[in-house]
From Swiss-Prot:
GO molecular function, one term: ATP binding
Organism of this sequence: Solanum tuberosum (Potato)
Positions of the UniProt region annotated as Disordered: 586-631
Localization terms from the record: Plastid, Chloroplast membrane
Protein name, entry field: Plastidic ATP/ADP-transporter
A GO CC term assigned to this protein in UniProt: chloroplast membrane
Amino acid sequence: MEGVLQTRGLLSLPSKPKIKAFYPLPQGGLRNRFNSLSSLKPNPLNGVSLSSNGFQKVQGFDTKPQLFGQKKRCFPICKAEAAAAAGAADGQPLFVEKEQPKFMGIELVTLKKIIPLGAMFFCILFNYTILRDTKDVLVVTAKGSSAEIIPFLKTWVNLPMAIGFMLLYTKLANVLSKEALFYTVILPFIAFFGAFGFVLYPLSNYFHPTAFADKLLNTLGPRFLGPIAILRIWSFCLFYVMAELWGSVVVSVLFWGFANQITTVDEAKRFYPLFGLGANVALIFSGRTVKYFSSLRSSLGPGVDGWAISLKGMMSIVVMMGGAICFFYWWVNRNVALPTRSKKKKVKPNMTTMESLKFLVSSKYIRDLATLVVAYGISINLVEVTWKSKLKAQFPSPNEYSSFMGDFSTATGIATFTMMLLSQWIFDKYGWGAAAKITPTVLLLTGVGFFSLLLFGAPLAPTLAKFGMTPLLAAVYVGAMQNIFSKSAKYSLFDPCKEMAYIPLDEDTKVKGKAAIDVVCNPLGKSGGALIQQFMILTFGSLASSTPYLGGVLLVIVLAWLGAAKSLDGQFTQLRQEEDLEKEMERASLKIPVVSQNENGNGPLSSESSLNPAGGDSTNASSEPSSPRSL
């Protein structure tokens, strides 16, 4: 019996109990049953007592009637009040939780997280695709502007705005709850895009300083066309910056921060890659939406500002999707419980902005994450800006440019959807480290193909003419394929890898680290690529002349990216192991014995002599001490 009571500190039952005879209870209950059976007499267990809730319980033995000449044996009737009380005191259930209901092999509790998160991601990326395609058309095709404005915007406008937002976000994170912080950040975006479509763009001719910009251009010369264009079309540039911030703030900080808050690492491994399935369906549909509005502009009669009509329609969709995002966020906060984390986390301190930056810079883990983000931004920018310059030359009109971008977004969605289907298999078979290295490898290989075509396009002109293409058109298509494959790898593997890396961190590093990396490092990567290109142009005279050197820079950046991914893989694995060990230790510390050996303790029975009192009938003692009896 002692062996039974000591098993893992819990009251154990046999895995395959033998069926014993049961007798119907009299109307008076179990106590009257014993009183009514005169042939059965209690056999006291001297020297042994069980404690429940601090009170002594007198224990007795009751034997079955002799059936078919069975050997008489005594078994205790054990009560588990002590176990229940001990379990309740620690908040731990005495018995195993019953299995959660499932649908298609997935727990319903998990589905309550995954479906709304997938819908949120769908709406966020639907908006991002529309905003991304629209911002380039606005600033590149505006009167008095050109593609030269983009590097200046990324370096001298977008980066300072991103840094300013990060500083503000860090301060707000110290004083607002997570839910209030989410609404405080996303609602100004929704309001601005609605106001731009219905107020700012229709009235832009009244507050754009066109005459003043013309005077500056005549005075300073065409070399300053880009900076002057920022002043000339400042409201369009503000739209450009807000669209860029939507990608870094709403996608990276708000959505992924919320997803990391309510999911576990195991759920993230299984479902993070699948979040992109709904998101890339959004890419396909949003690409078709941009394509539709491009055709609408071309079908309107002369004298009608078709672009203004298109903007009103697209910004209305953006506002409606923003409302849906807020609804899904509200619903999840009201209906989904947060997962239990290891309690051994750092206490969140109140840090100043400079202290936060110093803390983040001192962390090797955060530095490696920042390297991944900056390297991606520089690498994709080195190829993408060069590709957009060729795209502008091939499709100079806004209608053609926007129509091609709609097709590009649709193709990106299809390619990414396919990669999403493979991503979970990649995570399961090869792990986090291999998945993190796929994106830089893809970008390197496709980038080499694109730059090679730019360098050796002239000798290939006769061959390309047989297929009805010029070297310029071929470069546009190859560059489009490079961007499609790189972005699909980013959405399906790079983003989930990056977000999974935040999960083992403590809450303070997670919140402030995401703000610093996603809001500052992402624009820093793009601005860094733009600065490299500006330096190359000033040094070698043109973008075409600097193409071989840009390819060399791309190689160095990607190699640094791969090194940071390898370093982060080791740190991530170590943190996961430490967190799992902490959880195991916490669970082990909560397990306590059930039956007390004295009136004050909860320890197991100390000796077998208490089960065999002196002077008692040893034959009546339990002959099967390790097999509990069904009563």
